[in-house]
Amino acid sequence: PVVDSDYVIFVAEVASTCNEALLMQHLLKKTSDKKQRAYLINYFLEQFRTTLYRQTMFAEFELKMSELTAKGEIVNAETATKVYHDLIDLYFGPDIIHDEYIDLEWARIPHFYYNFYVYQYATGFSAAIALSQKILSEGESAVKAYKEKFLSAGCSKDPVSILKDAGVDMSTKKPVEQALALFNSLLDEMDELMK
């Protein structure tokens, strides 16, 4: 029905990213050329880094800033810069050399000036990877569920329920674990290709 034809950003992210993941898996399946595989895997790994890891860091930054505000603490540029710096160290580790201005990156990210929503990119990416893996492993039955229970659902239910109907339960750790398992397998293959 027309009343349910709209969709929320989370659903749109899952749909587009699922299709991108399916295309990437298709391209990887079609080539054995080391350089082509390395290029494709690098591209896919960057999607993981920027969407799953980085957006999670952004969401944690938003959460920490909100918690400070809720406690009545003064939040200013100095506080935000310190919180962001600590998160960069946590997420990227001590071996990464940071650009001298990276601590100020928080000030130029437009997402931070809107409602708390960047977590949807990371969770949507995890859901999309889980859906794509389901389609690749189960075939036609998963494609049917993806089309009929996810893509066709619009806003007839909340996104988590729609995904559950399509076979991905976002109330569990499984979708994130599946995404991380794929990331690790891609990283292992990249290591082999670079030898």
Task: Set out the residue ranges of the language-model regions.
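C-terminal, non-catalytic "cap/extension" segments appended to globular domains
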Residues: C18-A21, K29, K34, Q55, ...
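Post-HExxH zinc-binding segment in Zn-dependent metallohydrolases
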Residues: D6-Q36, F44-E46, T50, G124
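Long, K/E/R/D-enriched contiguous segments that form extended
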Residues: L45-T51, T56, K64
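Conserved short loop/turn motifs at secondary-structure junctions
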Residues: S5-V8, K147-K149
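Catalytic Zn2+-binding segment of zinc metalloproteases
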Residues: P1-V3
